[in-house]
Structures are given as C-alpha cells and as structure tokens.
C-alpha cells in the first residue's frame, strides 16, 4: 500500500468514526489537530464534556487489530496534545479520552479509554 492509499484509508476510517459518533449524539468541534508533539484525530463535545478521540483502523484483526495498535507513546502524545489544546483555547471543563477502533466493518467505541 502506498502512503497516499494509507492516508486515504485513514481518512475514510475517520469519516466513518465521525459519522458513527455523531449518530451517538456527539458534536464535532475539530478534527486532525496537529502539534509538533502529537495529533488529535477528533475533538467532540457531549453536553459540557470535551472528548478527545483516537481513531484506529485495521483491515482485519489478523495482526492484532485496531485496539492493539495504540501504544503507550501514542497515549502520552494524545494527552499532551489535548492539554495543550485546552490551554490554548482556555477550556476549563471536564474531558475524557475515547478510542474508536475499526477492524474491517466492525466498530468498537471505548469511552474513557486512557
């Protein structure tokens, strides 16, 4: 798979994740927020709560699946990026970190994942 194909698959997975989460009542704030030290795939709100979401996609579970693809380093970078985002935007509210794992056609949403 070329890097362009990989990006397209990743974008499609994020689009699926966003549609799924909006169906669950979450509201999109921003997507693909990037800092030199980390990236946030989706930032959403549910009432007054801010939700930072990592989206992981795998075509199948053959090599461990999407859930196993989240490393401690990735979690640390997501935490740092979310803290930075909240400081920059002067947000003083509850937040949580969710994981949306997509393995082929299977979607698994884990709230308070980290």
UniProtKB/Swiss-Prot annotation:
It comes from Shewanella loihica (strain ATCC BAA-1088 / PV-4). It comes from the Bacteria. This is UPF0102 protein Shew_0226. InterPro entries: Restrct_endonuc-II-like (IPR011335), tRNA_endonuc-like_dom_sf (IPR011856), UPF0102_YraN-like (IPR003509). GO terms for molecular function: nucleic acid binding. Belongs to the UPF0102 family. SUPFAM superfamilies: Restriction endonuclease-like. Pfam families: UPF0102.
């Amino acid at each position: 798979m070329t890097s362009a194909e990989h990006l397209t698959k990743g974008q499609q997975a994020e689009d699926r994740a966003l549609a799924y989460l909006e169906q669950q009542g979450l509201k999109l704030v921003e997507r693909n927020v990037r800092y030199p030290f980390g990236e946030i795939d989706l930032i959403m709100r549910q009432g007054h709560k801010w939700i930072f979401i990592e989206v992981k996609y795998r075509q199948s579970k053959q090599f461990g699946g999407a859930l196993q693809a989240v490393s401690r380093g990735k979690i640390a970078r997501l935490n740092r990026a979310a803290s930075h985002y909240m400081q920059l935007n002067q947000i003083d509210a509850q937040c949580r970190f969710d994981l949306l794992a997509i393995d082929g056609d299977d979607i698994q949403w884990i709230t308070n994942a980290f």
